[in-house]
Amino acid sequence: MIALVDYGGGNLKSVANAIHALGYEFKLTSSPEEILSAEAVILPGVGAAADTMAGLQSKGLDKAIKELVARDIPLLAICVGMQVLFDYTAEGDNTKCLGILKGDVKRLPEGLKIPQMGWNQLKQRVSHPIFEGIPDGIDFYFVHSYYASPADPGIIGATTDYGVDFCSLVISKRLIATQFHPEKSGSYGLKLYQNFFKMALGDKK
């Protein structure tokens, strides 16, 4: 089962449409038990990190997400879903986050149009199955004002330049996290979802 985490926010409809377009079944859930019994989990994200953390904590989903990563259950985290995996974010009043990944989340540099909203290039830093069939340098769709700064550069799977060369994709064991929105990124965004599901589920749908 694929679990799509419902914490009271996030880009649920477009993510759900992307999953359906690929022919996969999923369950929209806010149950920690269902999330921990899933074969793959998607943590979507739109909006403020503090609101996301409050939504997760109110349903006990913060602990469930920490546990699923500890169990090495495949997780795909998107946009704010990626940011809250780190220790804290500069958004708001240095909001404390999940601390699954070491590092913090910084604001994009002043002097640029913020938020970054639109297409930007993904520069692949490693060879990995998540990039299968996706040429290096393809544009993906971004909407964000903050970016993750991992303490361990070894988890940086791709970077993007917007005044600063920032981490736009994380790979850590079976955890994949993207600053961009694959569900809004056309055929290559769908391909990234497909690659994640293939890594998690094999040929099963």
Curated annotation (Swiss-Prot):
Cell compartments where the protein resides: Cytoplasm
Main location group: cytoplasm
Pfam families: GATase (PF00117)
An MF annotation (GO) of this entry: lyase activity
Catalyzed reactions per annotation: 5-[(5-phospho-1-deoxy-D-ribulos-1-ylimino)methylamino]-1-(5-phospho-beta-D-ribosyl)imidazole-4-carboxamide + L-glutamine = D-erythro-1-(imidazol-4-yl)glycerol 3-phosphate + 5-amino-1-(5-phospho-beta-D-ribosyl)imidazole-4-carboxamide + L-glutamate + H(+); L-glutamine + H2O = L-glutamate + NH4(+)
Glutamine amidotransferase type-1 domain segment(s): 1-205
PROSITE patterns per record: GATASE_TYPE_1
SUPFAM superfamilies tied to this protein: Class I glutamine amidotransferase-like
Recorded metabolic or biological pathway in which this protein acts: Amino-acid biosynthesis; L-histidine biosynthesis; L-histidine from 5-phospho-alpha-D-ribose 1-diphosphate: step 5/9
PANTHER family named in the record: IMIDAZOLE GLYCEROL PHOSPHATE SYNTHASE SUBUNIT HISH
Name of the protein: Imidazole glycerol phosphate synthase subunit HisH
Species, as recorded: Dehalococcoides mccartyi (strain ATCC BAA-2266 / KCTC 15142 / 195)
